[in-house]
Regions:
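N-terminal strand-loop-strand beta-hairpin
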Residues: 1-119, 163-190
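Mixed-charge, glycine-accented linear interaction segment located at domain edges/termini
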Residues: 141-173
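Conserved, surface-exposed functional patches that form binding/active-site neighborhoods
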Residues: 104-143
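General N-terminal targeting signals
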Residues: 23-25, 74, 130, 139-141, ...
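A short, polar/proline- and glycine-enriched secondary-structure boundary/capping micro-motif
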Residues: 78-83, 134-135, 145-147
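Glyoxalase I/VOC metalloenzyme domain signal
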Residues: 1, 11-17, 129-133, 151-156
Length: 190
């Protein structure tokens, strides 16, 4: 089953969209800062956003506490779930021995919004070197076709005060960072 996530770049400040979401009955229920570091040994040229994610080992630190969670373990010898700040250099050395190099080092601030009855959250993300984006996926739509999922997500965002069209493309974060220019597609999980 393929899942659609939309992620549209926004052109006004966070406070503007915070106000719109709140005026439409949503509450800001969660905020965090995230630091993600991606490593790969594969050629990422021509890949989709999701394919890039699948080709990378990711370290994730939320709110700059304690250390980094290790995600997408592509190395069999990598039996590590978590590393501290002090262990990053040693971890990167092990990755380098296996041909993995750092390809992305990105920080973002997440702001999640929802209201009673919602099965998902609208996410406003302030992503360094990219800007402010709004993200949404909804598991209630997963059984629909890709186009139907996308249209439902756009309709849902518009019901919260946005004004997107079905023809609008979302911004792909990793592809944008990789190519150092904005890259767009219909599915930020595709």
């Amino acid at each position: 089953m393929l899942i659609v996530e939309v992620g549209f770049k926004l052109d006004k400040p966070l406070e503007y969209y915070d106000k719109i979401l709140k005026m439409n009955g949503l509450a800001n229920v969660f905020n965090c800062e995230t630091h993600d570091i991606y490593y790969t040994k594969y050629d990422l040229n021509g890949l989709t956003e999701n394919e890039m994610k699948q080709q990378c080992i990711r370290l994730r630190n939320v709110n700059f506490k304690e250390g980094y969670k290790v995600e997408n373990k592509l190395l069999d010898s990598l039996n590590i779930d978590f590393i501290s700040e002090d262990e990053i250099f040693e971890f990167e050395s092990k990755l380098k021995e296996n041909g993995y190099l750092k390809v992305f080092d990105t920080k973002k601030k997440d702001h999640h919004y929802c209201k009673e009855g919602m099965s998902t959250k609208v996410q406003l993300q302030e992503i360094n070197d990219i800007g402010l984006l709004v993200y949404l996926d909804n598991d209630n739509y997963y059984e629909l076709s890709l186009e139907e999922q996308r249209n439902k997500l756009i309709d849902e965002l518009n019901s919260y005060g946005f004004d997107f069209k079905y023809t609008d493309l979302g911004l792909d974060k990793l592809r944008t960072l990789y190519y150092k220019e904005e890259k767009y597609s219909k599915n930020q999980n595709g």
